[in-house]
Amino acid sequence: MNNSYKNYNSYNSYNNYSDVGGYKSLPFFKQAEIIYDFTVEFVKRYIDYKSRTKDQMEQAARSGKQNIPEGYLQKSLEGRIKLLGVARGSLEELLNDYLDFIRQHGYRLWEMNDPEAKKVRAFVYNNYNNYKNYNDYITSADKAANVMICLINQTNRLIDQKLRWLEEKFVQEGGFRENLFKKRMERRRVY
């Protein structure tokens, strides 16, 4: 295990990180966190440290993770939808960086039914899905990139589902400002 992640599990246990509700319990947040950590390690190993791609991949992975809690903590559905959309866009950008890496290096892209792809996709359904599940894959550039392609695709699908749900909720219930305005108008009628 890489030194930078040696204490990863003890950190999570110490802070009761995995037991916290809210956005930290969202499967796509957990996956975005793994994607970010894995990407930081990936670019250290396989992308030239002077390359602009290194910075862009790290920033896209970070944005994919960080916009989830920022959006989740918004009072308005519009804010949640917007920031979750930003997270989704960042992960799509990162997905394309990994696809470019595979193509530019002449590596084989795993097909959806490839045994390795199925194994990686199964990690997501594990209650203990965390960075160490993916640790064996970081030692090979082509496997590491393929693993992230699988995980990002899964995460994007989950975010898309959440966005559809939030959009439907917005249509049914209205937005934060709209509801505040209704409450204000009701109060005026009472007084």
Regions of interest found by a model, annotated:
Residues 1-191:
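Amphipathic alpha-helical assembly/interaction segments
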